[in-house]
């Protein structure tokens, strides 16, 4: 009998699409996140919002601020606070590199995706980002529109 192949599936829970439009993303990093049991159960039912969240430094540790994971409805009195600070698990070397960029160059750390990896652990993809100005956003929009128009013309006229 043949064995079934293990299919690597990355189940995305929440995605921050605004970050790609509002920021210039420079460096990506995968971080673990410290969660309670009820938070994991809430995430398994695909309830989370990281659109207005960011990461900040406190006591040489990286923390996720303002991420919303709603309360798990079946857990009554042992529930978690939806917008609490959550510790991110990143190596000291990477924390140092990100800390230098944030403190010296005025960058920010933005979460991009919250997902379950192949082993079933919750991971957060974060990026070192620099804010875009209004004219940069318009330029990005023009490039995207021209790319769509070009693809449409190629399909139509071959």
UniProtKB/Swiss-Prot annotation:
Q: Do the record's keywords include Nucleotide-binding?
A: no
Which Pfam families does UniProt cross-reference here?
A: SmpB
Name any GO cellular component annotation. cytosol
**What role does it play?**
Required for rescue of stalled ribosomes mediated by trans-translation. Binds to transfer-messenger RNA (tmRNA), required for stable association of tmRNA with ribosomes. tmRNA and SmpB together mimic tRNA shape, replacing the anticodon stem-loop with SmpB. tmRNA is encoded by the ssrA gene; the 2 termini fold to resemble tRNA(Ala) and it encodes a 'tag peptide', a short internal open reading frame. During trans-translation Ala-aminoacylated tmRNA acts like a tRNA, entering the A-site of stalled ribosomes, displacing the stalled mRNA.
- What InterPro entries does the record tag this protein with? SmpB, SsrA-bd_prot, SsrA-bd_prot_CS
Q: What GO MF terms are annotated?
A: RNA binding
Q: Which SUPFAM superfamilies match?
A: Small protein B (SmpB)
What family is this?
A: Belongs to the SmpB family.
Principal location class: cytoplasm
Q: Any idea what this protein is called? A: SsrA-binding protein
């Amino acid at each position: 009998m043949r064995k079934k192949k293990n299919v690597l599936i990355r189940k995305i829970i929440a995605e921050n699409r605004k970050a790609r439009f509002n920021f210039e993303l420079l460096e990506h990093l995968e971080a673990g996140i410290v969660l309670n049991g009820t938070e994991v159960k809430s995430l398994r039912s695909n309830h989370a919002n990281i659109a207005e969240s960011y990461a900040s430094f406190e006591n040489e540790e990286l923390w996720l601020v303002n991420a919303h994971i709603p309360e798990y409805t079946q857990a009554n009195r042992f529930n978690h606070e939806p917008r609490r600070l959550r510790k991110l698990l990143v190596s000291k070397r990477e924390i140092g590199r990100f800390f230098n960029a944030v403190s010296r160059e005025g960058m920010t750390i933005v979460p991009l995706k919250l997902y379950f990896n192949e082993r079933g652990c919750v991971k957060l993809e974060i990026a070192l980002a620099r804010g875009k100005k209004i004219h940069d956003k318009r330029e990005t929009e023009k490039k995207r529109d021209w790319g769509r128009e070009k693809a449409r013309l190629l399909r139509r006229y071959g």
